[in-house]
Swiss-Prot record:
Gene it is expressed from: rpl101
Keyword Glycoprotein belongs to the record: no
Xref: PANTHER family: RIBOSOMAL PROTEIN L7AE FAMILY MEMBER
Subunit structure comment from the entry: Component of the large ribosomal subunit (LSU). Mature yeast ribosomes consist of a small (40S) and a large (60S) subunit. The 40S small subunit contains 1 molecule of ribosomal RNA (18S rRNA) and at least 33 different proteins. The large 60S subunit contains 3 rRNA molecules (25S, 5.8S and 5S rRNA) and at least 46 different proteins. uL1 forms part of the L1 stalk.
Known function: Component of the ribosome, a large ribonucleoprotein complex responsible for the synthesis of proteins in the cell. The small ribosomal subunit (SSU) binds messenger RNAs (mRNAs) and translates the encoded message by selecting cognate aminoacyl-transfer RNA (tRNA) molecules. The large subunit (LSU) contains the ribosomal catalytic site termed the peptidyl transferase center (PTC), which catalyzes the formation of peptide bonds, thereby polymerizing the amino acids delivered by tRNAs into a polypeptide chain.
Protein's organism: Schizosaccharomyces pombe (strain 972 / ATCC 24843) (Fission yeast)
Protein name: Large ribosomal subunit protein uL1B
GO cellular component term, pick one: cytosolic large ribosomal subunit
């Protein structure tokens, strides 16, 4: 049973949107869900990791790069999406610094299905280490549909510290869109936790420059 009601999410979302209206920034603020865990020992308990696709794209400006074969490079070019060929990847020569720079430049990668197995061989473990191993796309898939899917997907991953944050939307969204994203993100997170709600110390939502609003 969810301990966060739609009504409480709504009132917090209203305040976030009102705050961002009053203080307009020259960029679109992201809305983030910040989670504080309790009764969890990252050394002993299983470190969870899970991804979920939200109903509304939380980060429309995400920088995405296609690692493609000829067919997908062509599709990317037509759509004005950044892309790299196998030859481009070979030029990086597994240089750790260059791969790291590539991983920093983009928020996510999509690779042609036929290339996915070659990525570690071409680039080494750099993309995996950055948590940005590419999502596969087949020739039958709609490339733009895939890009939207990647932009809609958020990842909860517990590392060594008991707090984590994920983007659940932005201030240009409607109230309903933000509420839908936040509710789904919260309930999915709880499903990943060993003791569910008993592991949640706090849930806070805030826009990039706005005040934090406590949900739980």
């Amino acid at each position: 049973m969810s301990k966060v009601s739609v009504a409480s999410v709504r009132s917090n979302v209203e305040q976030i949107l009102k705050g961002s209206e009053e203080k307009k920034r020259n960029f679109t603020e992201t809305v983030e869900l910040q989670i504080g865990l309790k009764n969890y020992d990252p050394q002993r308990d299983k470190r969870f990791s899970g991804t979920i696709k939200l109903p509304n794209v939380p980060r429309p400006n995400m920088a995405i790069c296609i690692l493609g074969d000829a067919h997908d490079l062509d599709r990317a070019k037509h759509g004005g999406v950044d892309a790299m060929s196998v030859d481009d990847l070979k030029k990086l020569n597994k240089n750790k610094k260059l791969v790291k720079k590539l991983a920093k430049k983009y928020d996510a990668f999509i690779a042609s299905e036929v290339l996915i197995k070659q990525i570690p061989r071409l680039l080494g473990p750099g993309l995996s280490k950055a948590g940005k191993f590419p999502s596969p796309v087949s020739h039958a898939d709609d490339l733009y549909g895939k890009i939207t899917e990647v932009k809609s997907t958020i990842k909860f991953q517990l590392k060594k510290v008991l707090c984590l944050g994920v983007a659940v939307g932005h201030v240009e969204m409607s109230e309903e869109q933000l509420i839908a994203n936040i509710m789904l993100a919260v309930n999915f997170l709880v499903s990943l936790l060993k003791k569910g709600w008993q592991n949640i110390g706090s849930l806070v939502v805030k826009s990039t420059m706005g005040k934090p609003h406590r949900l739980y």
